[in-house]
Design a protein with these regions (language model features):
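Beta-strand-rich domain onsets/edges
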Residues: 23-56, 60-62, 66, 103
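C-terminal motif of bacterial Sec signal peptides marking the signal peptidase cleavage site
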Residues: 18-21
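Aromatic sugar-binding surface patches on proteins
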Residues: 94-100
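Residue-level recognition of secondary-structure-to-loop junctions
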Residues: 93, 105-107
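Bacterial N-terminal signal peptides that target proteins for export
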Residues: 1-11
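Short beta-strand edge segments in extracellular beta-sheet folds
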Residues: 130-135
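Short acidic/polar inter-strand loop motif in beta-rich domains
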Residues: 118-126
């Protein structure tokens, strides 16, 4: 009869050691940069988490390095697994090539943030950034 309590105790100890490793770690700020369509698009998501977030995008001209302040930016955050489409939101120009985008992450998981950037007189550009949202 002593064997069953020992097996149960061993199971509890094993779970106590394994479960903390399954938790989502605190996510550091996500920063990334891509050059596409004559623009450099830099993302800073400042510790993405479940709930409301503000993503900051900086857009500069790839050739002149000057800020692009006249772009129209829309964004969609799509959950990867399970694949769920997100709601499209618009970026707000803050001046000097800086745009803020309100994004809501429903759960702690990986998302693809798809940005559509349109400058007057230019072809539209689509950029995708992976973002890991924490709890």
């Amino acid at each position: 009869m002593l064997l069953r309590p020992l097996n149960f105790l061993s199971l509890l100890v094993a779970l106590g050691l394994l479960l903390p490793g399954c938790a989502h770690p605190h996510t550091a700020p996500a920063t990334a940069q891509q050059t596409l369509g004559g623009m450099v698009v830099a993302l800073n998501s400042n510790s993405p988490h479940t709930g409301d977030n503000t993503i900051t995008i900086t857009v500069t001209d790839a050739n002149t390095k000057s800020p692009v302040g006249n772009a129209n930016i829309t964004a969609t955050a799509e959950m990867i697994s399970p694949r769920l489409p997100g709601t499209q939101v618009s970026g707000r120009a803050q001046g000097n090539g800086l745009y803020s985008i309100p994004v809501r992450f429903g759960v702690a998981t990986r998302y693809h943030l798809t940005l559509h950037i349109q400058r007057p007189g230019q072809s539209s550009v689509t950029v995708v950034f992976p973002i890991d949202a924490a709890e």
